[in-house]
């Protein structure tokens, strides 16, 4: 039965969980840093953070689906989406028997690459966003900030 799967908590599982936690923390911190550079007050920040919360909650619900069938092709591809990787990989690693190293290391690689790219984009937004204090940007304007030199 799908609901009677055993959770395997061994040393490698723990190490991978720490790695995905740290990568997810840095990734979402970068997203919130970009958000902080674009807003001037807490009220504006609450308005802009809704999409970030939706991605996180969506990943949370997807995690339960993946926990039922962690070795499917769909679970593999979902685990490569950086917004969902930290949560989905917790489920895949804990429930899969054995841990599939190729998918796990590929997820780590994609997460590292997307985090580096995100930090680069956030640094551009932050540089311009700090200078534009008092002006409420749109999403389209934030994309223009990325292209500024």
Enumerate the language-model features and the residues they cover:
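Short, small-residue-biased leader/transition segments that mark boundaries at the very start
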Residues: 2-3
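Membrane-interfacial helix-loop-helix junctions in multi-pass membrane proteins
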Residues: 7, 65-80, 84-112, 149
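Transmembrane helix segments
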Residues: 12, 43-77, 84
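Alpha-helical transmembrane segments of multi-pass membrane transporters/translocases
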Residues: 15, 97-128
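A structural motif at transmembrane helix-loop-helix junctions in multipass membrane proteins
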Residues: 18, 22-54, 69
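Residue-level hotspots within the lipid-embedded alpha helices of multi-pass solute transporters
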Residues: 21-26, 61, 80, 111-116
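Junction motif at the cytosolic side of a transmembrane helix
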Residues: 34, 38, 113-149
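Membrane-interfacial segments
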Residues: 39, 43, 70-71, 94, ...
